[in-house]
A protein has these predicted regions:
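Active-site catalytic microenvironments in core metabolic enzymes, especially phosphate/sugar-handling
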Residues: 1-90
Length: 90
């Protein structure tokens, strides 16, 4: 799982070194990670790609961070404001 924007080089490095069946990422440039995965599958490698979206992939971590941070900042209210999915699907 590589949430947010790790970049194509990190995605591909993880795919090569870890050899996952499924690489779950936050976002990708269409000319990097998706092309690598397509080429890998054409070469017979057993790997798939799931792109969650940048903000959606980071949302759980941001909610956790607000809970973790609150006790560290006594006297200051810490609030996580959910960004939700920025896209509407028809």
């Amino acid at each position: 799982l590589l949430p947010g924007a790790w970049g194509g080089l990190n995605h591909i490095k993880t795919a090569v070194e870890e050899k996952p069946d499924l690489l779950i990422i936050g976002e990708a440039n269409e000319w990097e990670t998706p092309e690598y995965i397509r080429d890998a599958r054409l070469l017979g490698m057993n790997i798939s790609l799931l792109i969650l979206g940048h903000s959606v992939s980071e949302e759980p971590g941001m909610a956790w961070m607000a809970e973790w941070l609150q006790p560290q900042l006594t006297g200051i209210k810490v609030t996580h404001v959910s960004s939700d999915d920025p896209f509407t699907w028809l």
